């Protein structure tokens, strides 16, 4: 089904323009999400949660898998993601117009259709009150949909919402910025993050992101 959807929807993208981008230089074993399960990636804005999601998508797409991102807040930036190594021709982007109910229905359709390596449900910009109103049966339905498959459902947000239905919970935290240049002309080289596996409990993993430009 995934191939059929992309064949129907794919359009030629525009040429990438020069821009700064955030690129994770590796994924540690601690951060590999389990297949056939729900994972949550949590953190505040600028905590590295989006960079981690992009790295997970890039790794999956590099293996030839088809992926999907369900964008509740219309915040996905294709240009920066292309610069981060994501092959857009194999990525389905679903825009939901800031309506979580549409995002949930889209996720349900995609998961039950099958054929996707990683499905990202981006709820980062949804308020905590909105997330609390999501009925719990949604998460049980999603868990049943991915069980015994090779798919990953990665839910991105600021607070945990899937409860016992999530097999993995990773919390991201921004640490230090790395600078070069002089005191008068500082240059930002990159940002360090820390990823803590809250479920299952494991040692925290340091991550390093670099800034650059691609034309």
Locate predicted features:
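Detector for small/aliphatic-rich hydrophobic stretches
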Residues: 1-69, 83, 214-215
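Helical mechanochemical/support elements of P-loop NTPase systems and associated helical scaffolds
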Residues: 20-23, 34-37, 49-53, 77, ...
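Hydrophobic/aromatic beta-strand patches that form the interior of the parallel beta-sheet core
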Residues: 39-41, 68-70, 92-94, 154, ...
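Conserved inter-motif catalytic segment of the P-loop NTP-binding fold
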Residues: 55, 63-130
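ATP/nucleotide-binding catalytic cores
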Residues: 89-91, 108, 136, 143, ...
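Conserved P-loop NTPase nucleotide-binding/switch module
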Residues: 120-151
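Phosphate-binding/switch region of NTP-binding enzymes
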Residues: 143-215
């Amino acid at each position: 089904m995934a191939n059929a959807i992309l064949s129907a929807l794919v359009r030629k993208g525009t040429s990438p323009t020069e821009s700064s981008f955030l690129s994770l230089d590796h994924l540690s074993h601690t951060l590999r999400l389990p297949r056939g399960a729900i994972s949550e990636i949590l953190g505040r804005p600028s905590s590295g949660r989006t960079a981690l999601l992009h790295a997970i998508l890039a790794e999956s797409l590099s293996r030839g898998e088809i992926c999907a991102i369900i964008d509740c807040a219309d915040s996905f930036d294709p240009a920066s993601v292309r610069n981060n190594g994501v092959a857009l021709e194999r990525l389905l982007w679903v825009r939901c117009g800031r309506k979580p109910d549409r995002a949930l229905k889209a996720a349900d359709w995609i998961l039950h259709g099958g054929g996707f390596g990683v499905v990202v449900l981006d709820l980062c910009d949804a308020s905590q009150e909105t997330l609390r109103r999501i009925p719990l049966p949604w998460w049980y339905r999603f868990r049943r949909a991915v069980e015994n498959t090779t798919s990953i459902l990665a839910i991105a947000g600021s607070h945990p919402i899937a409860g016992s239905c999530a097999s993995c919970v990773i919390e991201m935290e921004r640490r230090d910025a790395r600078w070069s240049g002089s005191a008068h002309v500082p240059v930002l080289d990159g940002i360090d993050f820390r990823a803590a596996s809250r479920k299952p409990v494991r040692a925290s993993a340091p991550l390093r992101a670099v800034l650059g430009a691609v034309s």
